C-alpha cells in the first residue's frame, strides 16, 4: 500500500486513500457505513454544494451531529475548499447552540433531524442560515444526502486547506471560539500520537467511544486513523460492556478514552470483562481530564503497558507520557513536548521551584497562535507575553516531569467535560429566595467530579420548597451535564474577598 505524502491537508487525505483503498471501510457506525471512496465522494459533493451556494474560502459552516458518517462528510468537504468548520456539542441547549452558530458566523449548519428544537431556534433567530438535516426529514431543513448528491463528486481540482474553530466554555459560561488566522504546523502531540500508534493500515482498526464534536476524539482518534488509512468505528452512546464487545468483534487496535471510561470498565465484573477477547488492542490514548493513579495503574495491570497519556487543550500546549515512563513517575502527565516550553508561575508571574505548585503556562507557537474569536479581553487574559495558560494548577519535579494538582479554581471537570460554574450560579440566582450561591465540583468516584450547589437563602425561606423549585429551574434552564447533583444550604455566609467575589476555593476545600 502506498504511503500518504507528508503534511497533506486533512481534508484531502481521504481522497488519497479513496484512490488506493477505495473499497475499504473508513467508517462503521450505528447510523451507517462508508468506504473510503464513498466518504471521499460525499465530501466532494458537499464541498461543491457549498461553492454553488456562493460560499467562499474563509466562510464558516457548522455541524451538530451525533457520531455518524455524515458528520465526517460535513467536516471534510469544507476543509477541502478553504472554509472554517465548527463542530458543536449537541448536548447544549437550543439557546447555547444558536449563540455559537451566530458567533462563528456559520452560513450553513448540518444537524441531525432529531434535534428539532435546534432547527426552530436557529431558523427563528438566524433565518438566513441554510439548514440541512443529516438524516431523516425536517420541514425547516434541506435533506443532506439527497441534496448534496446532486453535485459533482469528483475531487476538487484546486483544493484549499480549511481550518477548524472549536469552542471551549468561557469562565462566564459563554462558549469561546478558539480561532487561528492561519493553520499551525502539526503539533508535537499529534506527531507523538502517530509515532506511538504506529498504524498498520493492512491490519489495524480503531474505535472512537467519545463524541466527534470534541477536540480530543476528533483530533487524536478519528483523524489520525483515517489519515493513516485505518478505519474507525464510531460509537453512538458509550457503554462499558458494549465497547468491549465491539473491540472483540472488530478486533480493534487503537482508541482514545477518558478516565471515567476507565473507571466504568474496571467496575464491570471480572466474568463480564473476561468474556471478550481484547488481545487485538495495543494502543490506548487518554487525556481530557486527570486520571487517578490507582485507576490508571489498574488499567495497565489489566491491559498491559499500552496506555499513553497527553496533556493539552483546544488552545494548544502539550506534554506526553508513555506507559513505561508513567510507571516510573505515577501520576505524571509527562515532560513538555519538544519545541514547547512550560513554566510554572506563582501569582506574581515568578517561576516557582521544582515541586512547588503554580499556574501552568505553555509557550505559544510562532505560527498559528490562537485567539478567542471576537473576545479580545479573554484572549489577552490567557496570555502572559509569549506564554498562555488554560488556568491549570500543577508542579514540575526535578526531573522535568509535570503533575496536575487541579484545574483552574473555578473549573469543574466531570467525565472529561469542562464545566464553568458561574453560568450555573447565575441560573440559580434567578430564584428570589436565593441570596448567594456557589457551585463547585466535589469528588465523584466515577466521573471525577460532580456539581454541588452551596446556597445562602434569604431569611425565612423554606428549604424544602426552594429545593423543589431550584430543581425545576435547573431542568428548564441548564443542559443535563450542567445540572447540580446535590444542593446544600448554609447558615453561615459564603466566604468572600474584599472585592466581593466569592472565594470558591474555600468553599471547595470543605468537600475535598
Annotate each language-model stretch with its function:
Residues 52-53, 80-147, 157, 457-459:
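Structural core segment of the AMP-binding/adenylate-forming
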Residues 71, 92, 109, 245, ...:
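AMP-binding/adenylate-forming catalytic core of the ANL superfamily
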Residues 183-209, 213-254, 268:
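Conserved AMP-binding/adenylation subdomain of ANL enzymes
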Residues 166, 227, 252-257, 268-329, ...:
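Gly/Ser/Thr-rich phosphate-binding loop
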Residues 350-381, 417-419:
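Conserved ATP/PPi-binding loop(s) of AMP-dependent carboxylate-activating enzymes
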Residues 23, 149-169, 173-174, 198-205:
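Conserved pre-ATP/AMP-binding loop-to-beta segment of ANL
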Residues 6, 25-68, 72, 76, ...:
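Conserved AMP-binding/adenylate-forming core of the ANL superfamily
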Residues 35-37, 163-189:
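Conserved AMP-binding A3 loop
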Amino acid at each position: 500500500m502506498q504511503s500518504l505524502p507528508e503534511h497533506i491537508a486533512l481534508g484531502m487525505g481521504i481522497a488519497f486513500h479513496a484512490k488506493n483503498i477505495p473499497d475499504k471501510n473508513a467508517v462503521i457506525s450505528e447510523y451507517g457505513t462508508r468506504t473510503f471512496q464513498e466518504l471521499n465522494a460525499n465530501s466532494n459533493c458537499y464541498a461543491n454544494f457549498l461553492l454553488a451556494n456562493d460560499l467562499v474560502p474563509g466562510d464558516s459552516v457548522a455541524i451538530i451531529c451525533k457520531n455518524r458518517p455524515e458528520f465526517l462528510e460535513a467536516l471534510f468537504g469544507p476543509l477541502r475548499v478553504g472554509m472554517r468548520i465548527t463542530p458543536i456539542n449537541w448536548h447544549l441547549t437550543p439557546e447555547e447552540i444558536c449563540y455559537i452558530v451566530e458567533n462563528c458566523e456559520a452560513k450553513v449548519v448540518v444537524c441531525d433531524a432529531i434535534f428539532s428544537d435546534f432547527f426552530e431556534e436557529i431558523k427563528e433567530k438566524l433565518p438566513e442560515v441554510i439548514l440541512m438535516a443529516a438524516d431523516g426529514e425536517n420541514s425547516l431543513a434541506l435533506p443532506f444526502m439527497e441534496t448534496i448528491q446532486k453535485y459533482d463528486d469528483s475531487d476538487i481540482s484546486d483544493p484549499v486547506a480549511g481550518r477548524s474553530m472549536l469552542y471551549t466554555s468561557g469562565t462566564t459560561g459563554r462558549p469561546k471560539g478558539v480561532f487561528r488566522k492561519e493553520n499551525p504546523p502539526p503539533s508535537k502531540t499529534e506527531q507523538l500520537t502517530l509515532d506511538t500508534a504506529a498504524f498498520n493500515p493492512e491490519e489495524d482498526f480503531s474505535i472512537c467511544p467519545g463524541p466527534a464534536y470534541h477536540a480530543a476524539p476528533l483530533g487524536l482518534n478519528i483523524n489520525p486513523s483515517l489519515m493513516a488509512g485505518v478505519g474507525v468505528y464510531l460509537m453512538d452512546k458509550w457503554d462499558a460492556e458494549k465497547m468491549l464487545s465491539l473491540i472483540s468483534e472488530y478486533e480493534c487496535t487503537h482508541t482514545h478514552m477518558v478516565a471515567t471510561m476507565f473507571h466504568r470498565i474496571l467496575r464491570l465484573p471480572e466474568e463480564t470483562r473476561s468474556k471478550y477477547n481484547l488481545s487485538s488492542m495495543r494502543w490506548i490514548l487518554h487525556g481530557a481530564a486527570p486520571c487517578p493513579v490507582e485507576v490508571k495503574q489498574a488499567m495497565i495491570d489489566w491491559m498491559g503497558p499500552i496506555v499513553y497519556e497527553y496533556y493539552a487543550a483546544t488552545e494548544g500546549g502539550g506534554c506526553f507520557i508513555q506507559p513505561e515512563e508513567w510507571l516510573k513517575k505515577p501520576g505524571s502527565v509527562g515532560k513538555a513536548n519538544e519545541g514547547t516550553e512550560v513554566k510554572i508561575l506563582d501569582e506574581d508571574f515568578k517561576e516557582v521551584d521544582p515541586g512547588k505548585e503554580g499556574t501552568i503556562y505553555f509557550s505559544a507557537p510562532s505560527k498559528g497562535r490562537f485567539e478567542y474569536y471576537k473576545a479580545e479581553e479573554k484572549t489577552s487574559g490567557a496570555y502572559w507575553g509569549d506564554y498562555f495558560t488554560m488556568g491549570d494548577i500543577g508542579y514540575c519535579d526535578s526531573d522535568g516531569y509535570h503533575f496536575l494538582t487541579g484545574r483552574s479554581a473555578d473549573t469543574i471537570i466531570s467525565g472529561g467535560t469542562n464545566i464553568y460554574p458561574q453560568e450555573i450560579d447565575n441560573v440559580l440566582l434567578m430564584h428570589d429566595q436565593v441570596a448567594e450561591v456557589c457551585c463547585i465540583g466535589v469528588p465523584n468516584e466515577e466521573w471525577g467530579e460532580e456539581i454541588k450547589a452551596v446556597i445562602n437563602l434569604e431569611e425565612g425561606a423554606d428549604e424544602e420548597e426552594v429545593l423543589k423549585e431550584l430543581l425545576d429551574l435547573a431542568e428548564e434552564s441548564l443542559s443535563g451535564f450542567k445540572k447540580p447533583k446535590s444542593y446544600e444550604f448554609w447558615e453561615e455566609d459564603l466566604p468572600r474577598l474584599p472585592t466581593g467575589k466569592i472565594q470558591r476555593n474555600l468553599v471547595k476545600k470543605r468537600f475535598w
